[in-house]
Amino acid sequence: MLYRKHKMRDDWVFRRGDLYLANMNPFKGSEQSGKRPVLVLQNNAGNFYAPTLIVAPVTTRLYKQDLPTHLVIGKEGGLYERSMIELEQIRVLDKQRCMFYIGRLSKQTMEKVDEMIKNSLGLMITEDMEAP
């Protein structure tokens, strides 16, 4: 087992920075799939009112660690193994896909996540920077 399990109730409140085990199937092409941890990225107001969540998948396969959208984290937030958050794979999931709560990432880790989201969405690119 790679994470702790916490049973979710019907009145569960999702929070930004939370980790959940979610069923990412069905998928297409290069999208992350299967039952895997996801990190909630959406703001807490959206988490409360919307039936969906904005998430990033988490994997224990630490390939391409040097990408500006891959954040390697240690055994944190209920994860039992070093893992990598793939912030180029941000997607929307229905809350019903979340199977159980794993834990929450630290404020310091979420600050790093925020920087990588800016990279992923092109929010840090200056006018003179261009893609190859």
Enumerate the predicted regions with their spans:
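Hydrophobic alpha-helical segments that mediate membrane insertion or helix-helix packing
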Residues: 38-39, 113
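Short, charged beta-turn/beta-strand-edge "cap" motif at the junction between a beta-strand
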Residues: 25-29
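C-terminal terminal-subdomain/extension
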Residues: 3-4, 76-132
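Compact nucleic-acid interaction/catalytic patches
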Residues: 32-34, 40-75
